[in-house]
Amino acid sequence: ESHYASLGRDLVNDGHEIWLLGGTGDQAGAAAIGAEIGEGCINLAGATTILDAIDLIGLADRVVTNDSGLMHVAAAVGTRVIAIYGSTSATFTPPLTDDAEIVSLELDCSPCFKRQCPLGHKNCLNNLTPEKVRLVL
């Protein structure tokens, strides 16, 4: 969450507006990210229908996303995708678009496809810095 918030703050400082999207299960994480970003960030996690989310993603210039359903929505509607892969792999579930950048550390322990790190460190995400993501924006 702190990496997303750091990236979001940088983007807001560069003049961008941030929309946080996701389901009800994403509300707590999105609230934490939104609170860290502050002004310039609109938290819509759990507050939109899937059709609303599709429309909003279609209006966006680009989407920074983890490997998720909304990543595939962004690819389908033609919005530029910056896809962050930690424990998953673009080899198995890539965004189906030519307008995508994949950001992954491709560690020896990944992909493990686990929500909880079996090694207890989550280096696949913790070491994937906001600066690395900014390089492909």
Where are these regions (language model features)?
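Donor-binding and catalytic core of enzymes assembling or modifying cell-surface/extracellular glycoconjugates
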Residues: 1-86
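Nucleotide-sugar donor-binding patch of glycosyltransferase catalytic domains
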Residues: 43-44, 75-137
